[in-house]
Regions:
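Rossmann-fold NAD(P)-binding glycine/threonine-rich loop
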Residues: 90-92, 96-97, 109-124
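A short hydrophobic/small-residue beta-strand
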Residues: 104-106
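A secondary-structure boundary/capping signal
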Residues: 17, 108-109
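N-terminal glycine-/serine-/threonine-rich beta1-alpha1-beta2 phosphate-ribose binding loop
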Residues: 1-101
Length: 124
């Protein structure tokens, strides 16, 4: 099954965070035919390496993990899958950067499911 956006082209996604969860997300995106437009990470052991290697795919994807989030987001995508934290208050700047670049946000962060109890000001 290939995920597509409006029209005949595949969804373009940015993997924002390349730890364990970002690696799982990468594998799922590749399996489903999503076009990976970029990868953002901060670990010095991962930045500069190929996303396929970092995610344990056993092959290169031709997508380098980059530390400069603004540069990656500035190149555009349909969505960013944000996998870099657990709390809305600390995640908000990452979400805002995506949205400011016209990129929709998908996240695994648990607090975003029902933020009204833990981050009511941000939930508004």
């Amino acid at each position: 099954m290939t995920l597509t956006s409006r029209g005949p082209r595949p969804v373009r996604a940015i993997v924002y965070g390349v730890g364990e969860m970002g690696s799982i997300v990468t594998r799922l995106l590749v399996e489903r035919g999503v076009e990976i437009a970029g990868a953002i990470g901060r670990s010095t052991t991962k930045v500069g390496r190929d996303l396929g290697e970092v995610a344990g795919l056993g092959r290169r994807l031709g997508i380098p993990v980059e530390a400069d989030a603004a540069a990656v987001l500035g190149r555009g995508a349909d969505i960013a899958i944000v996998c870099v934290g657990s709390y809305l208050e600390t995640m908000f700047p990452h979400f805002a950067a995506c949205l400011e670049n016209g990129i929709n946000v998908v996240t695994i962060e648990e607090e975003t499911v029902f933020p009204w109890t833990s981050a009511p000001a941000r939930a508004q």
